[in-house]
Regions:
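Short, acidic/polar
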Residues: 153-159
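Catalytic and substrate-binding clefts that recognize carbohydrates or anionic sugar/phosphate headgroups
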Residues: 1-140, 148-150
Length: 159
């Protein structure tokens, strides 16, 4: 997998992407796709088309778009995914009324991202987890009954 880092001004095309940067503006990338999925825990529709997504880990509860499990990686139906390797907030504009592609930006003058390809969406995820690390199997107790205090406080109710 090739890692691309860009700083500077102007526009540079590579593969299906175009990079944009103007003095004083966030660095942006725009990629062609038909369906985008991912970006970690979100309380919005699974298919991200038409959404503006801000990834920043915060505990906002289930009634907001804020989450504390943001993952700056999305996958498309065109057999590629994009990982934005930035510790700060990342803003995604996903085929909304403002853009016809996926566009993402970060504050500052440096954008560090990786385009992860594969023969299928499954293969893209395999390549991504090779890069980021494979998840461990959770302990058996996590597959049992869970109680939540998000929606009820009466634990004497029958379940």
């Amino acid at each position: 997998m090739e890692k691309l880092k860009l700083t500077g001004s102007g526009s540079r095309a590579f593969g299906p992407a175009r990079l944009y940067w103007r003095e004083g503006a966030p660095l942006r990338i725009s990629l062609a796709y038909r369906g985008a999925y991912g970006l970690g825990e979100r309380f919005t529709p699974y298919v991200k088309n038409g959404q503006t997504v801000e990834t920043w880990n915060e505990d906002g509860g289930t009634c907001t778009e804020i989450s504390y499990k943001s993952i700056p990686f999305y996958i498309t139906n065109r057999n590629y995914g994009v990982l934005v390797n930035d510790p700060g907030p990342v803003s995604y504009e996903i085929c909304s009324e403002h853009v016809t592609r996926v566009q993402f930006s970060v504050p500052g003058e440096k954008l560090d991202f990786m385009v992860v390809g594969g023969d299928s969406m499954k293969n893209v995820l395999e390549n991504y987890t090779t890069l980021s690390g494979k998840p461990a199997l959770p302990p058996a107790w996590t597959f049992g009954l869970w109680l939540t205090s998000s929606f009820t406080t009466k634990y004497d109710e029958e379940t």
